Structures are given as structure tokens and as C-alpha cells.
Amino acid sequence: MAVFEMQNARKAFGALEVLKGVSLKVEKGEVVSIIGPSGGGKSTMLRCATLLETMDSGTLAYGENVAAREENGKSVYAGKAALAQVRRQFGLVFQQFDLFPHYTVLKNVCDAPISVQKRDRAEVEAEAIALLDKLGLQGKENAYPYQLSGGQQQRVAIARALAMKPEILFFDEPTSALDPLLTGEVLRVIRSLADEHMTMVIVTHEMPFARAVSDRVVFLDGGVIVEQGSPEQVFENPQQERTREFLKSYRETSSAQA
């Protein structure tokens, strides 16, 4: 059974239809990168997947837990208790870190497992320190977010998401708010998670990274999945003209900035 499955998701903001029947299925241990132009629907799809937005129509499930079914052409969401269970199955790392500024690094990582999952504090703190060490943040447990670089803050955000022991981890442009010099350290962390077969969906504009780390690449544009396949197929032999145009534009922009 798939860890995550969205079928025929539609979402409009007023008269603007942002998602036009998007379907995505992610298997355990799979790394899926979502690429595409700004305004193409990537972040909206991620927000619908993680219950930050509701779909107008379509279905959403995490394993056996159904978050939304479809009735009479509309999405009908599960009750509060069922959705709380669904939320325990995924983690989300935003582009803007969203750390609590008045909490130490350790408390940022430990807060949700203790307060939401009601886990033992000593056990959670020991796991959190091990996570921080693994992510290259040794000795930062008592620091506050303002004392960290952007790359360090994003790694704390990743540790916070992992501390909840999710079955799947979503990333929304995890490096877009970082100085280019700090981007590499965050990408290395995500790559290490991929090497450990963490199930992940990554919305990214980092094409070389998407190519290197992904099992599957999905090109989303105009609210629809235009093309998907292996990194080799999508980047080296795209089948759709829109995909070819997007990659050509990306390469031209990258060359101009080099």
C-alpha cells in the first residue's frame, strides 16, 4: 500500500483554478521531486497534501487512513480525530523554517513529541540530541534561532520534523530562503535521508539536486502533472514540449547567472 496517495485533486481560489486534477502516489522509501515554474501549483499541491488547504474535489489518503473522500464531486474530509491521526503520519519542512524564536533549539525539536504525542520527556530529549548531532548541530541544543545561520535553522526544522517519526516527509522549497553558500549543507542532509530510504516529497528549484537524489521527478505546470518519470528520462529525454521548454529556460538562466 502506498504511504501517500492523492487522486484527482482540484483546488481553486476564486475564479483561478490552481490544481486541475492532480494525482500522485508515493511508495514507501521513494523520493519524489516536484519541479516546475512559479505559479504552476507546486506549493498548493503540497499544502493540500498536508491539510493546510482543503481540496475542492479529489481524495487524499495516508496508508489506510483516509483524510478526504469524494462525494457528489466534492471532497469530504474525515472528522477531527481521524485527521489528527493522519497528521501524525507526515512531517513538513517549510522554506521559512518557522521555528519558535523564544524556544531553544532543543525545545523546538522536543515540543511536539512531548506535548502532542505525549511521549516521555527524557526519551524524546535523548533522541533529539542524537538527531541534532546527526545533522551537524552538536552543541547547539541551548542556542536560540537568532543565534544560528539560515542553514542551521533549516536543519533544526528538519530535526523537528524527524522527531515526530513521520512515515513521509514533505519539503517546500527547503533552500529558497537560504544564501547560496548555505544551500549545500541543507541539501547534504536531505541526500543523507534519501540514502536511508526516508520517504520524501520535495518541491524544489534545485534541478541538479532533484536529478541526483530522486527516484522519480514530477513536472507540474498550469495545475496539471505534465510529465513524470525517472530523473534520467525527465532531464535527458523529456517527452512533452512544455517540459523541454521549462528545462531549456532553466539552463539558460543558470548559464546567465554563472
Model-found features: residue ranges?
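Short coil-to-helix segment of the ABC ATPase nucleotide-binding domain corresponding to the Q-loop/switch region
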Residues: Y103-D111
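ABC ATPase "signature
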Residues: Q228-G229
